[in-house]
């Protein structure tokens, strides 16, 4: 009952919050201008931008240059961190390959962590590298999505200014909400301090070091920005990051807030005036929510069913291996599905200990990579499936392939197919390399089907820019650091470039008349068609390898 109430409340909150995002996205005046405008102007002066409207090509260039500069600075800081200040625990520099992986991971909003948060980063790099990139990577994804939506919806004839979009989103959305969430988490017991690790004497007389630090400030943007990288190695399974059931709901709600609001924002932009949400966006929302609930149901059923091997021994009950007692199987399964659907990657239980079908659910969500998804890019990925569905359905019934009165031609379809293929190609090719390259497979700690699942999950998480993992995998090696770094880099930037190209290409040949020979995209059957095509296309791509992994493991457990 508490899960139903929570999900219902989040739908209502995101619907209302999308109205505020609408004013932020379209640079409309609001009551908070007096508070934020001066700070924004100061940021614009520091950046040196004159807020001129950019072409699509210029927008992408600045997006890539901004991200490239941040990535370089991050890499340098990680390989020299031991000689910098705010290092009371005397942590050492990261190796070149680990720093490469870490920098790309946080730059691309993935937060895949091959390092140990307690010993491999300092307080300085936690704050000015990890936390900073959590803000900017999230805002970058939002900015390119808003640029795409402005062109597709035809609300304006401009794409906008990259620096204006990113600064407004950080100042008006991320910073205020992060401060609020940090305070809420601190009230629940999440620490925020710059003191060195606690050193205590245990009952047995031994000395134990307890790691903590500025956790609350990172924890807030970690979930709000769908980042996922934990301050501690145990992530949100540790009491310092996620002390109780209330902090658990705060973190889950933070993950869902902005991606769900973005879909409603799209609907408000389609309705022109922003006071209501267009039916097309509502159809998309219901379709994605249906897939979300279906995967959640499968995961919860599997986790509550428990391990059949233990049942044969007379031990019944839910699967509690790798789970925190304070959350139980239900809230652990909900957190797992939310963190993979919204591509956050934080965990409040160990995914490597999930039942086979319990692990299948989050893996499928990352393979689909469209069920709400991360900040901005999730909606962009969904729109690729929407365009693909419109094109196929139109040809099947002999109608003109058009989306929002824009004809979909051969040029757009080539880009759409490329975007669709990048994701599975990266996952499948690099998974195969993990078994072929000498030494790479030595990181696998489980035999047979589960070992394949470990590899598939790691590569899928990197390709989906998620960051969670089956942490039984010993992934801090040169192969895994470099390979997943390359995957995260390619899967983030190539689709974004192609998606903006698609939007610009469609707008450049826009027809402003309503063609009666096009399919209706605001009817329930379009939502059903979208679900069918998502399942069919992804199923045909990934079912063979899933049979070798979680499905095969499920069939062998008796």
Curated annotation (Swiss-Prot):
Q: What's in the GO CC field?
A: plasma membrane
Which key words tag this protein in UniProt?
A: Cell membrane, Ion transport, Membrane, Potassium, Potassium transport, Transmembrane, Transmembrane helix, Transport
Does the keyword section mention Transport?
A: yes
Give the family per the record. Answer: Belongs to the KdpA family.
As for what it does, the entry says: Part of the high-affinity ATP-driven potassium transport (or Kdp) system, which catalyzes the hydrolysis of ATP coupled with the electrogenic transport of potassium into the cytoplasm. This subunit binds the extracellular potassium ions and delivers the ions to the membrane domain of KdpB through an intramembrane tunnel.
> What is said about its interaction partners and assembly?
The system is composed of three essential subunits: KdpA, KdpB and KdpC.
Please state what the protein is called: Potassium-transporting ATPase potassium-binding subunit
Name the species this protein comes from. Staphylococcus aureus (strain MSSA476)
